[in-house]
Amino acid sequence: YINVNVGSGSVREMSEWIEYMTSDVESPLTEQRKKNGRAEPWKLEYLGVGNENWGCGGNMRPEYYADVYKRYQTFCHNYSGNRLYRIACGSSSADYNWTEVMMKNLDSNNVDAIDLHYYTMPVWPEMESATDFDDELYYKTIAAANFSDELITRHSEIMNRYDPEKKIGLVI
């Protein structure tokens, strides 16, 4: 899994990284990969196009991100038998409007999945220890994790209205 930066990175930069990593055709980029010690291309299955674009990934509106996503994915070339599974940035938690807008603007010809961002730590980012917590924090974390089921159900319902054949996946 590689995630490309659509907030401050360029389409060309993304396209060249994909070629560098996955192509076996002789080119300046594949020659550079060989000089860097990797003769064979990597198998890259999952490609995230943007990350948390509603927040730290660019503070984008869903309509704007959908347009940006479509432009970037146009240049996500498959090299040497490597097929990229293109993942669009999905919503933060219960932002169902984000999913609605993505599904209105994207289809299975240009996206393979939409991801869902949900963090179950009730005091994140202050939570640093995986073992130093009290019972109250434990139960709050379990309650937050239980909310995942509702999120998956509701986002899936939106996706299924636009994609009844379920060609577009939901990635958690």
Q: What is each residue range found by the language model?
A:
Residues 3-7, 49-52, 89-92, 116-119:
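Active-site-proximal beta-strand/loop segments in catalytic clefts of secreted hydrolases
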Residues 10, 49, 65:
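Aromatic-rich carbohydrate-recognition surfaces in CAZymes
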Residues 62-172:
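Noncatalytic carbohydrate-binding groove/subsite architecture in carbohydrate-active enzymes
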Residues 27-61, 117-126, 165-172:
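Active-site groove signature of glycoside hydrolases
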Residues 1-5, 51-59, 131-143:
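Glycine- and acidic
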Residues 4-25, 82, 108-109, 113:
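Carboxylate/His-rich catalytic cores and anion/metal-binding grooves
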Residues 24-39, 94-106:
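Alpha-helical scaffolding within the catalytic cores
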Residues 4-5, 12-16, 28-32, 57-62, ...:
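Short, solvent-exposed loop/turn and secondary-structure capping segments
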